Design a protein with these regions (language model features):
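N-terminal secretory/targeting leader peptides
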Residues: 1-13, 24-238
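Core domains of carbohydrate- and sulfate-ester-processing enzymes
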Residues: 19-21
Length: 238
């Protein structure tokens, strides 16, 4: 779901853990004989663009953006034109003027070279990200000895910490990457972010809740869980 207000990887991890622990998530995965083990956290996407920075909602009207899935729908709802070129085609799409902007997490802007085509990057739009769970086969998990199962579960916090520390290293040097490449860091004003959340977030959230409830999945309960967990994480300084 776009524009939930997640700002940090620590908040992302907290929300994922809460959702994964909910019985509805376990039941959903059990259809494929799978058990949710842990998240592999990915930073919030932000956009790089060419030309003048876009830091007002009205400036997204007609903007051609490489954004897929829910993020594409969110940008479309504020007048942008999403395109779903593959990640490997994003650089050429920017270079050739097929798109004005590309939405990726920082590491992907580096990996796919889109940062090299950019004039600016939004530091805090934070429209959303891709949730990437690690799952295991239920039968295989149940077949583990107590000692092996305990070792697997004990390794999860260490694995999450590794993800967080690895990304922290990249984020620490991100400002120097921007400076090196001459990319302007654009801070979106809080009132503009609130506009995005209202126009590009809330309607999609409401539609998702209704769709889940129609399928017998407690969409409202899960949504409320996400918001309460996020508020708690922010309150603790994550």
């Amino acid at each position: 779901l776009p524009f939930l207000g997640v700002e940090t990887l620590e908040q992302e991890v907290a929300v994922a853990r809460a959702v994964y622990a909910h019985p509805a998530a376990a039941e959903e995965m059990a259809q494929w004989n799978a058990r949710l083990l842990m998240t592999s956290p990915m930073p919030q996407y932000n956009i790089v663009g060419t030309g003048e920075p876009r830091d007002e909602l009205s400036e997204f009207e007609g903007m051609r953006v490489r954004a897929t899935g829910g993020l594409g729908e969110a940008f479309k709802s504020v007048g942008a034109v999403p395109t779903s070129v593959t990640a490997t085609e994003a650089y050429q799409a920017m270079e050739g003027g097929v798109v004005d902007t590309v939405a990726f997490a920082q590491h992907a802007h580096l990996s796919f070279g889109t940062i090299n085509q950019a004039d600016w990057w939004t530091a805090n739009l934070n429209p959303g990200t891709v949730n990437c769970p690690v799952v295991v086969n239920i039968d295989a998990y149940d077949a583990l000895s107590d000692a092996h199962r305990e070792a697997l579960e004990a390794a999860i916090p260490e694995a999450i910490d590794h993800y967080l520390s690895n990304y922290a290293e990249l984020l620490e040097r991100w400002d120097s990457v921007l400076a090196e490449k001459g990319v302007e860091k654009v801070e979106i004003a809080p009132d503009v972010i609130a506009e995005f959340q209202s126009k590009a977030g809330a309607p999609i959230h409401e539609a998702w809740i209704a769709e889940m409830e129609a399928q017998g999945i407690p969409g409202q309960e899960l949504y409320d869980l996400v918001l309460s967990t996020l508020a708690e994480a922010k309150g603790s300084g994550s």
